[in-house]
C-alpha cells in the first residue's frame, strides 16, 4: 500500500514538473514544425549556417563567434 502511494505521488510530481518546466505548452509542436519549415525555405535563417570568425580576426566578446578558441581583447585567439 505504501509503495503504491509513493508511486502515485512520484508520477504526479514528475507530471507537474514536466508541465512547469515546459517552454511552451500551447502549440509547442506546431511552432517547432513551422520554424523548421521556415528554415528549410530560408537557409540563411538556420542557426547551423552562422559563420564563425577565424583566428586573430576582430571578434565580439558577447556573442562568442570564434571558430576555435575564445575572443580576447577584441580578437579571436
Swiss-Prot record:
Propeptide span(s): 23-49
Listed GO MF terms: ion channel inhibitor activity; toxin activity
UniProt note: domains: The presence of a 'disulfide through disulfide knot' structurally defines this protein as a knottin. The cysteine framework is VI/VII (C-C-CC-C-C).
Primary location group: secreted
UniProt protein name: Conotoxin King-Kong 1
Keywords tagged on the record: Cleavage on pair of basic residues, Disulfide bond, Knottin, Neurotoxin, Oxidation, Secreted, Signal, Toxin
Lineage: superkingdom: Eukaryota
Amino acid at each position: 500500500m505504501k509503495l503504491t502511494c509513493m508511486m502515485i505521488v512520484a508520477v504526479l510530481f514528475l507530471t507537474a514538473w514536466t508541465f512547469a518546466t515546459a517552454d511552451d505548452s500551447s502549440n509547442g509542436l506546431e511552432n517547432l514544425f513551422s520554424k523548421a519549415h521556415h528554415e528549410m525555405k530560408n537557409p540563411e535563417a538556420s542557426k547551423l549556417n552562422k559563420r564563425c570568425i577565424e583566428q586573430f580576426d576582430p571578434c565580439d566578446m558577447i556573442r562568442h563567434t570564434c571558430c576555435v578558441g575564445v575572443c580576447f581583447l577584441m580578437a579571436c585567439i
